[in-house]
Amino acid sequence: MNKIAPAEIASMLNDWYLAIKKHEVEESSRLFEEVKPLLDDMEEDQEVLAYFSLLELRHKVLLHEARGQGFQHEEPSHMNATSDMLKYYFFLFEGMYEAYKNNYDIAIGLYKDAEQYLDNIPDPIEKAEFHLKVGKLYYKLGQNIVSLNHTRQAVKTFREETDYKKKLASALITMSGNFTEMSQFEEAEAYLDEAIRITSELEDHFFEAQLLHNFGLLHAQSGKSEEAVSKLEEALQNDEYARSAYYYHSAYLLIRELFKIKKKEQALSYYQDVKEKLTAEPNRICEAKIDILYAIYAEGGHAETFHLCKQHMDDLLSEKEYDSVRELSILAGERYRELELYKEAAHFFYEALQIEELIKRTEVI
């Protein structure tokens, strides 16, 4: 049997790469299934194999971002390619994977390594993608100004390219998230409104559910819990979204807002739904977060729940969920202060301050 020329496989990989860049989930999945079995029949070429391995990781990241799928990754044994472009992709994709695992310092180091080769990448979309990934990481770390600086560069490029509307919408969501955290709610809503206009043209209902979650987050942060609950419940009506890992983010936020507006029965109903789901699909992070909410709201936040809350906070710290610990520490502190349990309140407020200092020490690109 004749071997397939590496150039033929490389051409297919370029088509796959373009689908990934455009955030075309179904097309990316189709091309992955088409090209993977052909590698066994290809003439040996380490550069093409390395290119495939890097695109496979980026495809997994796309499925996580666009459909909430988890993934595992092992560094390929044939990563001995020498071109600057492959080195760039290697550091970028490995950084994306470490960010997914909440290994922030490692991710930032890998992004810095990738940045050394960025000037050698002629594609403006690829440069915009780099800035968007870095912007999302710093948003997750609560370093909003740094995140905005990177994300603005991505928005500028994606606005100029009509084939990358979903990427533009994704960047706009990150812009909105930063302004939400900075309590600049009008700016945040304007970016989300633009994103929803773009999304309505794409007919991607999963992405629409993600946007609804972000509207819920915006309303929650601006003190409009009723509106937040409405948007979050609407997001969870999308069956595919409700089956994805993003379900846990929306369910947690929904339970939190229901407790805040004293709709205890509804909050407990969702709490039980999540607990049942967790028996089949364990998620240590979500379980710790909703159990903290249960302890401080449903059980009254009395002194006996303090050690339980502390234990769950430690679980979140072990998973490097720093932003969650900061947020929940403030909630717990406020709750214990309301109950005049000042020693317990002081502990959690101090915990929030420690996390703030930890995040500030994170290296900046």
UniProtKB/Swiss-Prot annotation:
Tagged with keyword Manganese: no
First and last residues of every TPR repeat: 135-168, 169-202, 209-242, 244-284, 326-359
Pfam family, one: RapH_N
InterPro entries per record: O-mannosyl-transferase_TMTC (IPR052346), TPR-like_helical_dom_sf (IPR011990), TPR_rpt (IPR019734)
Induction: Part of the rapG-phrG operon. Expression shows a slight decrease in stationary phase. Repressed by RghR.
Gene3D superfamilies: Tetratricopeptide repeat domain
Regulation of its function: Inhibited by PhrG.
Major location (coarse): cytoplasm
Keywords associated with the record: Cytoplasm, Repeat, TPR repeat
Record note on disruption phenotype: Disruption of the gene results in the enhancement of aprE expression.
Keyword Acetylation: no
GO annotation, cellular component aspect: cytoplasm
Subcellular location: Cytoplasm
Family statement: Belongs to the Rap family.
Biological role stated in the UniProt entry: Involved in the regulation of expression of DegU-controlled genes. Inhibits the binding of DegU to the promoter regions of aprE, coding for an extracellular alkaline protease, and comK, a master regulator for development of genetic competence. RapG does not stimulate dephosphorylation of DegU-P.
Protein name from the UniProt record: Regulatory protein RapG
Species this protein is from: Bacillus subtilis (strain 168)
Lineage: Bacteria, Bacillati, Bacillota, Bacilli, Bacillales
